[in-house]
Structures are given as structure tokens and as C-alpha cells.
Amino acid sequence: IVGPKVETENSTGFCYHANESPKLGGGSEWHFEELECSLAATSMLLVRIMVGKVLDGYHVAEIMRNTPVRQGRPGWNCVAWVKEALETLKVDNKALGTSMLEWSIVRNIAIAYCQRKKDQHRFDGQGNFDMRKAPTYDLLQQKETIA
């Protein structure tokens, strides 16, 4: 998700991702999706990890649009797509300013943060959280910005 620096209740951003859909007759295929989206929590969005500051939103969008979807490659999935997109952003000098795009760090922090939120009952309704907001971790500041 690419969103504004300062969020308001009705802020929107753009969601970029590789999505798997069933094929008529069996099997599935991957396709790229770009959607304007709310920044509010959804059932498909567990956590957000802020990895960089956008310098040129158009350039970020072009990189996302041009990150390939790899049909028929065993083991390839949306996580592999994110990894490749971040690697492309990392070597580009126009899209992002300050950023942390080292895949092993981003992946490990995201997994650990999601587990921490699960342990705190963020997703099962037992905790005391504002469920309208997605829990967010700022990797640049190394701190949680939305619980």
C-alpha cells in the first residue's frame, strides 16, 4: 500500500499486489492488481510495515506495474512478488527517499510483528484495539505507530 504521510479517517492509498485467481477448468493464475483503497483495517490486511518515504509516486507505481507476475513457476507467490518489487525499488534512485528495503529484514520484521499482534489478540476480537485502523510498524523509526 502506498499512502499519504499524514493519514486522516478517510485517507486512501493505492494497493499493489499479485493476486491468485482460479482458472476456468481448474488450476489458477496470477495477475497484478492496482486498486485505490482505504487505509483502514480489512480482513485481508493484517499489518502494515512502513518501509520507505515516497519521492515520486508515479515512479513507484511504474515499478509496481512492471514487476512481473511469474506464471507457472513452482513456489512462486505474492510474497516473491513483493520481494522482487522491493529489490527493484532498492536499486532505483527516483522512487523512494529514506527507506529500508533489505528483504531479509523486511520479511523478518513483518513476520515477527504480525505474530506479536496475534499474541496480543489483535485479530480475534479479544484485545482492546481500534479495529478500524491497521496495526502499523515504522521500519525506519523502528517503532509501532498504530497499535
PLM segments and residue spans:
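Non-catalytic ligand/cofactor/substrate-binding and regulatory segments of enzyme domains
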Residues: 1-76
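Activation targets extended, charge/polar-rich intrinsically disordered C-terminal tails
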Residues: 65-147
